[in-house]
Amino acid sequence: VATLTVSGGIATATYAGAHPFKVGYVAQFAGATPAGLNGNKAILSVTGTSVTFAAPGVPDGAATGTITSKAAPAGWQELFAGALANVIALKPSVVEATGCVLRVDDTGAINARVRAYEAMSDISTGVGMTPLESQAAGGLWWPKSATANATARAWILVADARGFYLAVAPAGGDRYTLLFAGDIASLKSGDAYGYLLTGNQ
C-alpha cells in the first residue's frame, strides 16, 4: 500500500500498481496507524490503483506505518500441517460449524483426491468418512488439468468461514468444473452432518 488516507469515515488505499480487489471483496490490512484501519475490511469501491473501505471513528488524515494488504483468510484451520507431502486436512474454525474435515490428496498430476470425515486423528486416519470406500474407492476426484504439463489452468475460489466453491478449467478456456466443500444450510435444526462434498467419481 503506497498511501492510506481517511476522509469522512471512508479510507482510501492507493497502490503503486494494480491490486487484486473488487467491490465486495474482503481485504486484510496491517501495519497502519491509527490501528482502526487494520483488520478485515469490505471493499466499497475500486479504481485501477486504489480501493475504499469504511473507517468509522477514524479521524481524517493520512495513516502512517508500513501498510500491507492481502485477501482476507476465509477462516479455515489446517490440521496436521506438514505431516504428509501434498496432503492437507482442513476444517472450518468457526464454533457454529459442523467440524467436519476435508482431506485433499494433491499428489496426482492431473487430479486431486478428496474425502470428508466427521473427525480425524491424523492426516491419514479419520471416522465418519464420506464417500465410503465402497462408493468411490480412494475418494472423489477434483480435476486440476486435462494433461500433465506446465500449462497454467484458470481457477476461481469463493470461500467463507464454513464452505467454499472451487471452479477449475482443467482443459483451459472457459469451461469450468464447479466443486464444493463445507457446511450447508440444513433443513434440520442442529444438523451435525450438514456437510457437503462434491467431486467426480
Model feature map: region roles:
Residues 1-10, 19, 31-201:
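Small/polar beta-strand repeat architecture
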